[in-house]
Regions:
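Short, well-structured N-terminal submotif of metal-dependent ribonuclease cores
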Residues: 1-41, 54-68, 135-147
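A general alpha-helix detector
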Residues: 10-11, 47-52, 87
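Alpha-helical structural signal
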Residues: 29, 46, 66, 104-107
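Structured helix-beta-strand junction loops
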Residues: 35-36, 72-73, 129
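Short secondary-structure boundary segments
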Residues: 43-44, 104, 123-124
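Active-site neighborhoods of divalent-metal-dependent phosphate/nucleic-acid chemistry enzymes
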Residues: 75-118
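Acidic, PIN/NYN-like endoribonuclease modules and their adjacent C-terminal/linker elements
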Residues: 108, 112-148
Length: 148
């Protein structure tokens, strides 16, 4: 599939001009679109992003972001339903040595199903599990996993 996944970190960096990765993530998103590639995200990522923008940047910024992505012909939302949810749960257990969010695991499950290899994000976890990350800059530090 000629598409690139966009994770919460990528969306947040694009939305927040004060984010250190703003220019790089915006450039990666724009280059992806200019190359004629589709952006793909999930309902879980949209939920997480909308909530983060709302609490970090305010309700007006959240509404602006929503209007920009809602109905875009260049963006496809994938729903995390029963089978995908179960695959994400299995990944959540499989990667117990990493400090992952469940939303990360839902993204991994969808990306694998759709055979997507590239993601726009600031989250280093995607690189840790084998995906190509845009922008190709050093990822933000991730927390040290807790021992179970």
């Amino acid at each position: 599939m000629n598409a690139v996944f966009v994770d919460t970190g990528g969306w947040m960096a694009c939305a927040d001009r004060s984010d250190p990765a703003h220019a790089a993530c915006t450039a990666a998103r724009d280059a992806t679109l200019e190359a004629g590639r589709l952006l793909i995200t999930t309902d879980f990522v949209v939920d997480e992003t909308l909530t983060l923008i709302r609490f970090r940047l305010g309700l007006a910024a959240a509404n602006t972001w929503w209007q920009q992505i809602d109905g875009s012909a260049r963006l496809r939302w994938e729903s995390v339903e029963n089978d995908r949810f179960e695959r994400a749960r299995n990944l959540f257990v499989l990667y117990r040595d990493k400090d992952l969010s469940f939303t990360d695991c839902t993204s991994f499950a969808v990306m694998r199903e759709l055979r997507l290899t590239t993601v726009i994000t600031t989250d280093g976890h995607f690189r840790q599990v084998g995906f190509d990350v845009l922008p190709a800059t050093r990822p933000r530090r991730t927390r040290t996993p807790r021992r179970s």
